Amino acid sequence: NYTHRTNSVTQVGASLLPIEEKIHYCEAVYANYHTPSIFKISPLIDPSFDELLAGKGYEIQHVTETMTMELSQFQRYPSVSAEYEYYGRNSGLPSFVVYPDDVIVQLQDRITDEWITSLFRLNGTTNPTLRRIVPSMFKAIPKETIVASIEIDGRMVASGLGILDRGHVGLYAIYVDASCRHKHYARAICSTILSEAQKKGITHAYLQVVQGNAYAKSLYRSLGFEDLY
């Protein structure tokens, strides 16, 4: 979520700066926005960093698991039909993909203010600071995106976001309204994003899921995802 995965400090490589200096800098940035300092710990980094943070009073607040898939192993959810606008519009994406039981996934090639506002309502984001910061985070994504939604009577009841980068697609913002669970909405959203990414030459997919979310993990495994760590 925005407080943890999306809004965390992630180590991406070695640095010549002293680790204490980097921690202090990150803490100052978070303090400026009146939000808690969040550091992401993964098996890919030096375990001593985890120990260093623990020594400073940091605690584990949120645990996620990473899943990956080679799209050659993708088990797609068969669609019924797709509707395209004129050639070149929407970055070649269909405007609508129809699934059984009249489930219609809408696609856009960019993140709009309307989609973000609907996402906040869908995932229950009410914190004023997050509602102010998160839109700029979405708008700052420098990569190609596949933005998905399902609407009922003009109201978004399911969402998904695919971010394409160097042969990989990441699945983000997979949410379904509580009143619409068990209708294959999440399966339709994920399958649509993965299918369209594959058409664009993407060969691998990844996602993160909250530890203990057995229903989501079952869905992702049925699509072909496997645990990485």
PLM regions and their residue ranges:
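A conserved beta-strand-loop-helix scaffold within acyl/acetyltransferase catalytic domains
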Residues: 129-177
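A short, internal acetyl-CoA/4′-phosphopantetheine-binding micro-motif in the GNAT/acyltransferase core
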Residues: 10-17, 174-181, 210
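Conserved GNAT acetyl-CoA-binding A-motif
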Residues: 33-42, 197-208
